[in-house]
């Protein structure tokens, strides 16, 4: 309709929409060679953190938009059809923490028999939460905070949710190779 004028939609006349994204990914890793105990033995592990926080605000402002009637030779303002001043504010955050520990062994005997094996433990935990709020019928768009919107129940809304998941597992693998011609592999999880 007339309120979806493409020229107006690419301007900030009908309002603004701003979103901020913040992300942090860390994965420190350590490896220790345990050749002093037996050649080819090692231990390694890591701790991974994936964190994100996002927030945003959209502000809808009414604007003047006219249609012309050639029958009456008059312009009609459709500002009422563009809505009232309203604000939608939201945020969400999530984090995943993963811990992994592994002990492994790699060695070749008599230049013919190669053994490569490891056993590993891993656990991961994920958390997510979100919060949102909406208000309409502001007197002005100069203070677009939720507190300054209408206090009437029909003119406001809010919501949110959260999720938490976790997992733990053990896994491992044993490889045996003979003169790089024959290979046997066993995997367990």
What are these regions, as identified by a protein language model?
Residues 2-58, 86-109, 114-116, 124, ...:
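Outer-membrane beta-barrel transmembrane strands
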Residues 1-6, 61-84, 127-158:
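Surface-exposed loop/turn segments flanking beta-strands in extracellular/periplasmic regions
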């Amino acid at each position: 309709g007339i309120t979806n004028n493409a020229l107006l939609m690419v301007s900030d006349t009908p309002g603004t929409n701003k979103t901020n994204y913040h992300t942090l990914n860390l994965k420190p890793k350590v490896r220790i060679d345990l050749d002093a105990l037996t050649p080819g033995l090692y231990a390694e592990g890591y701790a991974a953190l994936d964190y994100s926080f996002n927030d945003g605000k959209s502000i809808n402002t009414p604007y003047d938009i006219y249609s012309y009637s050639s029958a009456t030779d008059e312009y009609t303002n459709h500002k009422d059809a563009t809505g009232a001043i309203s604000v939608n504010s939201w945020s969400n955050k999530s984090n995943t923490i993963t811990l992994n520990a592994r002990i492994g062994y790699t060695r070749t005997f008599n230049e013919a028999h190669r053994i490569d094996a490891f056993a590993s433990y891993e656990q991961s935990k994920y958390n997510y939460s979100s919060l949102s709020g909406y208000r309409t019928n502001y007197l002005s768009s100069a203070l677009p905070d939720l507190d300054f919107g209408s206090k009437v129940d029909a003119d406001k809304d809010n919501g949110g949710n959260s999720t938490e998941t976790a997992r733990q597992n053990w896994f491992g693998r044993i490889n045996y190779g003979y003169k790089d011609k024959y290979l046997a592999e066993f995997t367990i999880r």
